[in-house]
């Protein structure tokens, strides 16, 4: 199995598990959400491969098959981890697609390293621009909400995950229709296998301030968000992010929950393949507008 070394903790290497599928110069890097792994992109992987892309997925530190260190659960480190991956794979031009927490990596990577090698960016149900309510960010969420989540994860993270996924997929509306009991259980199993340290330490990272990072995005960008997202309401995240990025396209999935990459995969995949282009037909970085 392929791994990339991103650091060390004591005598042990910190390694990220990744998968690299397809071929060609039109490369897409998919960055997963909390508390899942790169495998959560399965419905997008097949669609993007069919459209002629090379597709790379990886597991964030602490999740999936990657190492589970006790440190590094902040967006500067997450961006550095991503940098290690694209450097190892010698990617000269690639598009970044982030879901949920992964939207933060898209923003911070470009904010930290510029968009020099990034052709396009896609943020799906993302955490940017800034979730915490402050004097200069009145649209944010009260800090006590995040404190409550941390308490719930600390007290009994498995019970927290089970409850979290109800609003992740809006199961009261879509269970048995757009998501099966088996798929829901599979998500729980992945979450349960995550690092206990990571599942707690990532919560305060959700309210990282990405406003400067988002403002630095100067490449074609697509923001996709569900209108019924209960985890990251669209008005607090997706709509604001799209407004802060010059020329960004906003695509609203009507009735879509947080995890539209699963429940509304056909709609998301159509948007993705249209925006990213089909294989080498379109030059990397060329702008498409509806």
How would you name each of these model-derived features?
Residues 230-236:
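Conserved alpha/beta-hydrolase "acid-adjacent" motif
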Residues 77-94:
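Conserved acidic catalytic loop of the alpha/beta-hydrolase fold
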């Amino acid at each position: 199995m392929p791994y990339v070394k991103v650091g060390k903790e004591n005598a042990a290497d910190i390694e990220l598990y990744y998968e690299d599928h397809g071929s060609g110069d039109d490369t897409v890097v998919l960055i997963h959400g909390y508390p899942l792994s790169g495998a959560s992109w399965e419905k997008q992987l097949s669609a993007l491969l069919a459209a002629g892309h090379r597709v790379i997925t990886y597991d964030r530190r602490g999740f999936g098959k990657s190492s589970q260190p006790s440190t590094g659960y902040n967006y500067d480190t997450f961006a550095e981890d991503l940098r290690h991956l694209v450097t190892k794979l010698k990617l000269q031009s690639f598009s970044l697609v982030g879901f949920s927490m992964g939207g933060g990596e898209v923003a911070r990577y470009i904010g930290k390293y510029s968009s020099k090698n990034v052709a396009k960016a896609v943020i799906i149900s993302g955490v940017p621009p800034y979730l915490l309510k402050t004097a200069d960010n009145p649209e944010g969420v009260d800090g006590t909400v995040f404190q409550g989540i941390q308490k719930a994860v600390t007290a009994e993270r498995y019970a927290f995950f089970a409850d979290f996924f109800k609003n992740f997929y809006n199961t009261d509306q879509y269970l048995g229709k757009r998501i099966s009991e088996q798929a829901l259980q599979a998500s729980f199993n992945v979450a349960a296998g995550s690092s206990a340290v990571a599942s707690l330490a990532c919560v305060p990272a959700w309210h990282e301030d990405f406003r400067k990072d988002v403002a630095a995005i100067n490449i074609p960008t697509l923001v996709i968000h569900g209108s019924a997202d209960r985890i990251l309401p669209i008005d607090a995240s997706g709509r604001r992010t799209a407004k802060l990025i010059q020329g960004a396209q906003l695509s609203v999935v009507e009735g879509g929950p947080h995890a539209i990459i699963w429940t509304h995969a056909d709609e998301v995949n159509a948007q993705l393949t249209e925006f990213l282009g089909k294989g080498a037909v379109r030059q990397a970085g060329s702008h498409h507008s509806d």
